[in-house]
Amino acid sequence: MDKFSWTNEELSALRSLILDHHKIVIFPHTAPDGDALGCTLAWSGILRQVHPSASVHVISPDVVEDYLSWLPHLDELQIYSTDPKHCLQLISEADLIFHLDHNQCSRLRHPDLVMAAQASQAARVLIDHHLDPEPGCDLVFSYPEASATCELIHSIICALGWREYITSELATLLLIGLITDTGRFMYSHLSPHLFRTTSDLLELKADYPCIIDRLSYHNPERHIRLQGYVLDQKLELFPELRAACITLSQEELQRFGASKGDTEALVNIPLSIEGIDCSCFIREDKTQIKL
């Protein structure tokens, strides 16, 4: 039994929106991670099969980090930061827009991109697992109890009767979202449904060994050197609070030539220390402090 409480009416409305429209745009959030890319690329792959006469475009606000550059179907991605004119044209022509793995348009980051998405006359659908989705979408599938948006997308695909369209590559995309958003199934936000989803994706021939190999054994040298610096110089422990904190400034990030992907898992490292239950990572970006 599915743990998500959508209605048959909502599923019927979603099916109709998809099949009645022909120019579809799908957005992940800015600086897309494994869940954002996995769910958007997998969803676009499904839509292309069930509605072959439609044009389906995934528009990422930013380039993809190196650690995800091997993902299947990545060549289908449109990158706003490298070709804004083309992406804005696709948005202006769209009659259906999907917002996946983000709860508000501002998470597209680029002002012109945000404005184009908000000004579009297209029907809009939000599918996400973050709290407090902004109003304005025609259909909202917001379930914070989900471990990842890829978990939601898999459930929606199956509920629509489209499981047969999940190829091995699409299953791999959905599994990468589950693995990365749960810290390889180590975070507390886990559920039996998550593992049933994982089991089904493996049955559908998701390439689990490839995912683990790419995430574990293909790190650039700068990633390892940054990690060593953080552990030696930047890790602060607060045993009385059972907590740890890591901070990195812009100068330090630039010194190592680090990208966002190089800092992705730093916050998890202190949790392997006996007596530490809480870990915080604070990064200075160009325009904000990221917690």
Each language-model region and where it sits:
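Short, conserved loop/helix-junction motifs that constitute active-site signature segments
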Residues: L90-S92, L113-A122
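N-terminal glycine-rich phosphate/adenylate-binding segment common to multiple enzyme folds
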Residues: H102-M115, E134
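Short glycine-rich anion-binding loops that position phosphate/pyrophosphate groups of nucleotides
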Residues: A31-P32, H102-C105, H130-D132, Q250-E251, ...
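Generic beta-sheet signal
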Residues: I59-P61, Y80-T82, L100, I127-H129, ...
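Short glycine/serine/threonine-rich phosphate/pyrophosphate-binding segments
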Residues: G34-T40, C105-H110
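A short helix->loop->beta-strand "cap" motif at the edges of active sites that frequently abuts
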Residues: H51-A54, A119-A123
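Hydrophobic helix-and-loop "lid/oligomerization" segment in the mid-to-C-terminal part
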Residues: D2-P28, G38-Y67, L71, E76-I79, ...
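Short alpha-helices
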Residues: I127-T197
